[in-house]
């Protein structure tokens, strides 16, 4: 295992694989990769807060289900609201909140932290700078365990200095590890990454 910094595009690849798991139907059926979070069996780092946002995103404020609502999906590592379509509302006795029929976020916003981007390498020290990932898939869905490959802009860093590019590497780890107790910091500066939902792929 290596210390690693995941650039926003790399982290988006991981989160987008799991984001349909916020849906009411997926959670009610027990098939969500976020089941452990919403059942209280696991928590993410308290640094992690995610919203389904309306303002500032690229998605329209309406779906075929009606007007979307801003939702706090994860609050400081703990489960928040779920995405509820009209069908799930009727089936499970919930209140619909404008989620699309697939019940995945259309404009997922992850709150930033306190780390300045210019200090990333210094904070990393020695380890991997991972700029992008691809071929992501589940190796163990109930555990939110993901596998995939580094893509480009992956470098070996020593003592806060980039030493060399790294050949393609395979990863296999759980979202509860990436964003769990081992998470040390999040960068402060937001980055808008269009078209990153699971349903949009």
Enumerate the predicted regions with their spans.
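Internal alpha/beta scaffold segment
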Residues: 1-22, 80, 178, 186-190
């Amino acid at each position: 295992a290596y210390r690693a910094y995941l650039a926003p595009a790399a982290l988006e690849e991981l989160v987008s694989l799991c984001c349909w798991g916020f849906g009411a139907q997926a959670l009610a059926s027990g098939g969500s990769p976020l089941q452990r979070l919403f059942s209280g069996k696991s928590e993410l780092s308290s640094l992690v807060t995610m919203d389904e946002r309306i303002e500032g995103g690229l998605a329209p404020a309406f779906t075929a289900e009606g007007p979307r609502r801003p939702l706090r999906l994860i609050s400081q590592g703990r489960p928040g609201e779920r995405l509820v379509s009209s069908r799930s509302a009727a089936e499970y006795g919930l209140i619909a909140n404008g989620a699309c029929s697939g019940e995945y976020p259309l404009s997922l916003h992850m709150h930033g932290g306190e780390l300045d981007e210019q200090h990333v390498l210094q904070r990393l020290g020695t380890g991997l700078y991972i700029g992008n990932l691809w071929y992501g898939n589940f190796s163990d869905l109930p555990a939110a365990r993901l596998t995939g490959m580094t893509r480009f802009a992956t470098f070996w860093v020593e003592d806060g200095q980039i030493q060399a590019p790294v050949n393609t590497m395979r990863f296999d780890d759980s979202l509860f590890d990436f964003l769990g107790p081992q998470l040390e910091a999040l960068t402060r500066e937001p980055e808008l990454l269009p078209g990153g939902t699971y349903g949009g792929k």
